Amino acid sequence: MKNATIAAALSVAAAFAAFAGEQLTSLPKPPKGGRFKTPTDLVWPAKPGEADVCLWSGDRFACCSITIDDNCKPDHDWWLKLSDELGIKLTWFVITDHCVKKNNPGFNGTWADWQRLADAGHSIQSHTTNHKAKHADVPMPTDEELHSMYRDSLKAINDNVTNNFACCIAYPRGEPHPEIAAKYAIACRGVHGVPNAANAVDYMCTGKGAPGKGHVQMVAFGETSEGPKWIQGMKNLRRGWNVVLYHLVHAGRDDATRAKNAASAEAEVRYIASLKDERLWVARFDDAVKYGQERDSATLESALKGDKIEFTLTDRMKDDIFDYPLTVKVRLPDGWKSAKATQGGKPVVVRFVSHDGAPYALVEAVPDKGVVRVVSK
């Protein structure tokens, strides 16, 4: 769907109404025990024709999203250069009134600056219109203010930035108002400092981990000897989703301090990126929450039918928003050396892999887009 059409859909709360339990725009809070039992390792279906929705895109072991708040234009070139070198995409949560009112564009950026980042493949999301939250002498925003802060910020981004779909919010100061936010956003980032267990993501107030090795290794490996010490026992984080938050990287009163802070951030990001090919899916925030909610609500049925495998993949999410492909691992018949696939008659991305001598296909399929047929090349 074109950006303008999606933006129009998001401009009214009615677009986020759920009908008879289907076409959901976000999932409710997870039950106490989680939505499912998280597999401790990669899953390998045993019999030809069997299939499984991978926990993360590309069958990665875990997930990490790097987010940047508060506009911070002075860092844009630094982030663009580093992310391009490392082959990763980032998510900016933007305070939009600064752009609408052209407040201090040297720090807050202009729409042209955000378009530049979107054109490079990064995600531009909302940190509300004005970052208002209760603190010190500032009162809690009224419900009317919150509706405007959430709705108008998403609309401003979608009206001014193409090649991008603003559908997520980072709560100012981590102050959540999920009932109101759910009328406009598919997910919101909180700031409580723990990565997300894969089976228990609260999509309307996600956790926020840290960029240090302790947090990263707990999701990527399920264990760590790095600090903080308290995280070392949180085995439920294995295969989870770590959401990293940065503000101004080049912060400090003098050049030496600014350089030191930037070097520290660069080392953290480089370590995360070093795990991206197999252990981590380094995902834009909106891609991760689309994948997660599609996966959490998906139904998969597959069967071997003669010389082909067919499967259907459905979910409970709103189809014109939740369009990120899920990775479906399909056990192929013995002897297959390659595979190709179509969904609804159109070719889809397939990667052939083997495990313990058995052939598999990793098929990228979008829920509710038709039957998927897998055949040998």
Q: Can you say where each PLM-predicted feature lies in the sequence?
A:
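N-terminal pre-catalytic segment of deacetylase/amide-hydrolase enzymes
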Residues: 21-65, 107, 285
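Extended Gly/Ser/Thr-rich low-complexity repeat segments
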Residues: 319-337, 368-377
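C-terminal domain-boundary segment and adjacent tail
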Residues: 35-40, 44-50, 100, 158, ...
